[in-house]
Amino acid sequence: MKKKIIAICIGVILIVGMIITYIVLKPSTEETNLTKINLAEVTHSAFYAPLYVAIEDGYLEEEGIEVELILTPGADKVAAAVLSGDLEIGFAGTESAIYVYDGGEEDYLVTFAGLTKRDGQFIIGKEKDFDWSSLEGKEVLVGRKGGMPALNFLNALKNAGIDASKVNINYSIDFASLSGAYIGGTGDFVNLFEPNATLLEKEEYGYVVASIGELSGEMPYTAFYARK
């Protein structure tokens, strides 16, 4: 009788162990049904908060999508990563997709959704007092020539009635290095997204003096694209 009870106990333990192992190792239905997408993100900024909320709060998973963000500084590099097939989706300025199309690429990039419709850059200066004419004769760090931040800054200058030829626009510093260059003493003004703009002011390297988006108006500033 004692041997029988021991055998039953061992059997129960084995069954319970098998059930636990099955539950732990079996992928959930939700996991197996998710389509994983690698998304090239041009920069990480509070400006893109809706995207982060959609990922963290599970809104994309509800649609069957699992997104992994890959920081890829520079819209040109985002476009290259998508064209090469290294990443499925690009998230950057729409100008990068236009350049690819104009270049005659057969499998060009197609923009299928937008996130931001206004420039999120702020101008940082060394003095609190500012009007747009303050930029005349001064060096302004704007990032890569032909990039959306630089193009939109030119648009803001035009809308402010400022002749761009009277502003020393520095295109030589890549977008990801703008804060460091300005802290290091390059330029009189620099155009930055948040949180970098506020951080520079907090660390007393300058003052947030103007919003570029306020003057440049609405436009498809940052969007999602994939190969045709």
What is the predicted function of each stretch?
Residues T32-F175, A181-G184, D188-P195, Y205-I212, ...:
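Short, glycine-/small- and polar/acidic-enriched structural segments
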Residues M1-P27:
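Secretory targeting signatures
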Residues A223-K228:
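Extracytoplasmic/periplasmic substrate-recognition and gating elements
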Residues L200:
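Short helix- or helix-capping micro-motifs
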